[in-house]
Amino acid sequence: MLPSRKTKRVFSCDFTPGRKRRRCVVVPSSVSPVPENTTGADLLDSIPDDLVISILCKLGSTSRCPADFINVLLTCKRLKGLAMNPIVLSRLSPKAIAVKAHNWSEYSHRFLKRCVDAGSLEACYTLGMIRFYCLQNRGNGASLMAKAAISSHAPALYSLAVIQFNGSGGSKNDKDLRAGVALCARAAFLGHVDALRELGHCLQDGYGVPQNVSEGRRFLVQANARELAAVLSSGIQARSTWLSLSQPPPPVVPNHGQQTCPLLSDFGCNVPAPETHPANRFLADWFAVRGGDCPGDGLRLCSHAGCGRPETRKHEFRRCSVCGVVNYCSRACQALDWKLRHKMDCAPVQRWLEEGDGGEGNVQIDGNGNGDNVLLPMS
């Protein structure tokens, strides 16, 4: 048998890669193939609703602007539903529900009403102020503020005190000084600075309460101390513009070894203006858009920029008896505006009371140069 002859293989210069044979895997008909997830696992779906609500409560209570909360509503359908939970709405911060006056609409009104129904004290106070002063729904606005005041909401207590002092929404005979002092005392007990200052003036002047000058002075000093403490705790860096004294230093008088502590209200320590509450900012913007300093019908706005309250009848507010230009809804607003602005602008005029627009009987008494005792009703 002849040996087999080996043939020579001829290779070309072109390289062709080999192909792997496909393996056929039989998938049972009862098992459906798992779809590919190109975006990764959604971890939010694995978090229980209770935990998400707890996180949203923390977010809402610390929000610095409405956008912080609105962005959550725009994230997804689940977060929007959980964010509108009454537990979350009841704990929203004042800045989270701070509605702009030029953005006021039926939707924002419904949102505030929904927060009120959820039990938010801030929403009760804010919507109450808007309805009482802007929408002129006096009864409903006062009831909303009273609802917040019953739960010891300090700004609502103070606002009701201002209404009682002025008889807002009624006639001059509707003033209830004793009720105003009682509401003011409750707000002052809760640490409200304006209420402390207002109560101090009432005690000093015997306005709605037996006169007690020393106790009134103590409340005024406490109000200034709390005002300074709020600035220091807010983290604002020390600047010479507010650390310096607003008045020239008094002459040096020998004190015979006694330690003296100058009172802030006497020496006018320049601190930044307190932050305006969103409700007061809404009032100021609302009437600025609709007529500036005159809401209409001869009514006037409180001259303190951080207030925004309008008169509900002619000559309701106190007027400066030196210049007759500025008007104030309360002694607290008058004292703050004096420190911040009016003491540089106030100038006496020739008996402006003779013009026949003297208000409701306000005269000037001797003060201490800091605006604490500029206005005093005669009644």
UniProtKB/Swiss-Prot annotation:
Residues annotated for Zn(2+) 2 binding in this entry: C320, C323, H342, C346
Ranges for domain F-box: 41-92
Binding site for Zn(2+) 1: H304, C307, C329, C333
Organism annotation: Arabidopsis thaliana
InterPro entries assigned to the protein according to its UniProt record, in alphabetical order: At2g35280_TPR_dom, At5g50450/At1g67340-like, F-box-like_dom_sf, TPR-like_helical_dom_sf, Znf_MYND
Coiled-coil ranges per UniProt: none
A biological-process GO annotation: protein ubiquitination
A Pfam family hit: zf-MYND
Record remark on domains: The F-box is necessary for the interaction with ASK proteins.
Family matches, as PROSITE patterns: ZF_MYND_1, ZF_MYND_2
Protein name: F-box protein At1g67340
GO cellular component, one term: nucleus
Pathway per the UniProt entry: Protein modification; protein ubiquitination
